[in-house]
Amino acid sequence: MKELAQFRICFPGQWVKDVVIPATNKEINGDPLTLSEFYIYLGCHFFMACFEGISDQRLWWSSKPVSMRDGASFRLNEFISLRRYNDITSAIRYTDKPPPDFVDRFHDVRQMIDAFNQHYAEEYIPSWLNCLDESMNSWLDKFCPGFMSFPRKPHPLGNEYHSIADGDDGKPVMWRIKLQEGKDRPKDATGKWAFPSKFEGTNAASGRKFSKTATLMCEMTEPIHGTGKIVSMDSGFCVTAGILHLHELGVYGQALIKKRKYWPKDVPGDQIDRYFDGKEL
């Protein structure tokens, strides 16, 4: 299978056809955007993202010869003109839904994220072992919605996504994402959180409450509920209630325990201490 064919299998193409192209064509100058032209435009974006230190995007369309000392390392004129590229960039839309009657700073991308998750939930079967973690989407404008700073990350500034991927065979495929909205999470006209999760409040079957972390764990693993598959997490997800909620939903969760003075609540720390007592580590 060629790279483009494999990419299109993994990409929510139906959403592009039904939403992106029609919504963009309502705004674009010149000829309507076609599906093939959209993939050319997207490919140019991906190609430019592979190179660092090119401060001016227009250099990719420069008429000057390629130089070892300055400018871009390639020219994109044979694929798309700079004017057409800018026209598409100005007109590109990722939703065809009207804005809600409350302030939602994520409205323009919410449908895109839902389309990605739905595509993988319907078309992809994750392996038996999966990894849930955080990912940073680098963004240098601190006024972007949901802007966060994590100094310990390689790219510390931008949007934080929680993401889950296959952990088997060393070939990870990310199959579900959730944008962390932080202080920009919207509320509806009644003052309640908009877009509530089905995993909030109390589990009717067990009577166990959902914490914020437990809610996130259940949301991110929803496509594999009832499968008996495993999700591995770092210490940020080491919440006993969350692990138990996953177990009740048919998913086995394991998380690194970051032990300080005391063991986490409900963990049989004394038994663990006795088991390792005298053993060589």
Label each PLM-derived region with a short phrase:
Residues 263-281:
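An anionic, glycine-rich sequence signature occurring as long contiguous blocks
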Residues 1-252, 256-261:
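N-terminal initiation segments
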